[in-house]
């Protein structure tokens, strides 16, 4: 979920030509800082009719009940034609609304099954630059193919 769209605004400011945000919270568009946000429930099989060069999902998976995690992963992977940046809270991280914290290796294994390769060096680089402490343990970068 993109929340109010802050990351979307940053990507757009840096010149990305097409930036869409998807959020599961109903009526999020009324709270958003970015105009191109759509409500989408990623616990249900979805196809938005477009693939993106990059899909970024940060700290969303841990809010998805375990019985829907495969659908969530399938959705974000299907939307990504090239690259996927994913973070998922690890066990013991804690946080409001966390119902499904997972070890990084479990997430990596799921995404690899969807046709992606884990980018260890790039993941490590992004983790080292992260400003939020939980991202230092959870950012994972994948490339299709």
Predicted regions and their residues:
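Residues that flank catalytic or metal-binding motifs in active/ligand-binding sites
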Residues: 15, 103, 135-138
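Core SAM-dependent methyltransferase catalytic element
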Residues: 129-145
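Conserved SAM-binding loop
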Residues: 1-92, 105-108, 143-144
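Short alpha-helix
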Residues: 100-115
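C-terminal alpha-helical "lid/dimerization" subdomain adjacent to the S-adenosyl-L-methionine
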Residues: 89-97, 119
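Short aromatic-enriched loop/helix-cap "lid" or pocket-rim segments at secondary-structure transitions
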Residues: 31-34, 69, 95-99, 130-134
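Conserved S-adenosyl-L-methionine
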Residues: 116-127
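A short acidic, often aromatic-flanked loop/helix-cap motif at beta-alpha or helix-coil junctions
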Residues: 45-47, 125-129
């Amino acid at each position: 979920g993109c929340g109010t769209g802050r990351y979307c605004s940053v990507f757009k400011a840096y010149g990305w030509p097409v930036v869409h945000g998807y959020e599961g919270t109903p009526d999020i568009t009324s709270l958003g800082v970015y105009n191109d946000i759509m409500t989408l429930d990623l616990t249900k099989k979805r196809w938005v009719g477009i693939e993106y060069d990059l899909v970024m999902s940060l700290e969303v998976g841990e809010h998805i009940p375990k019985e829907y995690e495969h659908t969530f992963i399938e959705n974000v992977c299907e939307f990504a034609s090239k690259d996927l940046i994913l973070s998922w809270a690890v066990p013991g991280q804690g946080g409001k609304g966390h119902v499904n914290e997972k070890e990084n290796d479990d997430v990596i294994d799921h995404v690899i099954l969807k046709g992606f390769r884990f980018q260890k060096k790039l993941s490590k680089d992004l983790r080292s630059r992260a400003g939020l402490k939980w991202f230092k343990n959870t950012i994972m970068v994948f490339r299709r193919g």
